[in-house]
Design a protein with these regions (language model features):
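Short, intrinsically disordered, charge-biased short linear motifs at domain edges
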Residues: 6-7, 192
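Lipid-exposed faces of alpha-helical membrane segments in multi-pass integral membrane proteins
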Residues: 14, 47-60, 89, 93-100
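Non-transmembrane, membrane-proximal soluble domains of secreted or membrane proteins
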Residues: 23-39, 67-313
Length: 313
């Protein structure tokens, strides 16, 4: 009877623990870069599991073989010092494991830093992703539009993100598309991604940047090229242009909803690259006198799956 209750308690504990589990975004890839990283994670888990099992098996063997017995008290087990086979295993196996993981890391890093596999030769969609306290600004030079705190991307096309910050160092991360990369002031870093399938995802700042860090997230939606083109057309027909005054207001610390503009801030506040490298962003000198009022209205997204309202200015 006691055994029955023990087993029931163990089963109940397992069920309760598993009920709180959900799929990890990094292990649910939606693009080739994320798939490469997920493969490395699973490979690492598998190898570590083998190591743990082998070590536990050796531990059980040693505890069993050299347990207390009826041998004389002055008995000493044979020493293995100087045993070349044992010493080679003890030293060689860890070295081989480190070398293997090093090779895997170099190969995978080269893959995720390059144009995604299967997309070479295609023109990427260049998106400037800049951060401020505590917002994300996405500029689409090719389409001449800009969004705040949400990102629409086409599937089956390479994406080239140009990352920089108007404030403290942040880290741009869309777990289901690839790894994180730092966005810093006075310089631009480049991140190559691609989405193989449509769907909604979550992106965030993965580097602590003050009291608003926890809410420093953005919505991501991947869609077909046709739907993406329709969205761009709708934005150009309904959104108001972004101005330098309005943009400087957005750079002030605080949270905002999802905003949409025509034009980009790159026209009057270019990214810190090329001849503009080292330019100081977010200076108080840039906060010029405000003129006019800015009216906002709800953006009715053409995609029925969009749950949150986008404000067009």
């Amino acid at each position: 009877m006691r055994t029955k209750w023990v087993l029931l308690a163990i089963l109940s504990t397992i069920v309760n623990v598993l009920s709180g589990c959900k799929s990890l975004a990094v292990l649910d890839p939606k693009g080739p870069q994320a798939q490469t990283q997920a493969n490395v994670i699973w490979l690492s888990i598998a190898i570590m599991a083998v190591i743990v099992i082998v070590v536990c098996a050796i531990l059980v063997f040693v505890l069993t073989k050299y347990r207390d017995s009826k041998l004389p008290k002055d008995y000493e087990p044979p020493y293995i010092e100087g045993n070349h086979v044992v010493e080679t295993i003890i030293v060689g196996v860890p070295i081989l494991i480190v070398i293997f993981f090093s090779v895997v890391s170099v190969i995978s890093n080269n893959k995720v830093e390059a144009t995604p596999e299967g997309y070479k030769g295609q023109d990427p969609l260049v998106i400037y992703a800049s951060s401020s306290d505590w917002k994300w600004h996405f500029s689409y030079p090719e389409n001449d539009i800009e969004t705040v705190n949400y990102l629409y991307i086409p599937t089956n096309r390479p994406l080239q993100f140009k990352l920089y910050s108007f404030g403290p160092i942040t880290s741009f991360w869309i777990p289901q598309l690839g790894g994180q990369k730092y966005a810093m002031s006075n310089m631009v870093t480049t991140l190559h991604l691609a989405a193989d399938e449509s769907g909604e995802m979550m992106g965030r700042n993965a580097n602590f940047s003050g009291k608003g860090f926890a809410e420093n997230t953005f919505h991501v939606e991947a869609m077909s090229q046709d739907k993406f083109d329709e969205w761009v057309k709708e934005v150009k027909e309904t959104a108001k242009p972004i101005t330098e005054v309005r943009f400087n207001e957005l750079l002030k610390p605080g949270h905002e909803g999802q905003l949409t503009f025509t034009g980009t801030h790159l026209d009057f506040s270019p990214a810190p690259e090329g001849e503009n490298a080292g330019h100081h962003h977010g200076s108080s000198d840039s906060n010029t006198n405000s003129s006019g009022e800015h009216m906002e209205h709800d953006h009715k997204s053409s995609n029925s799956k969009e749950k949150s309202a986008h404000n067009h200015e």
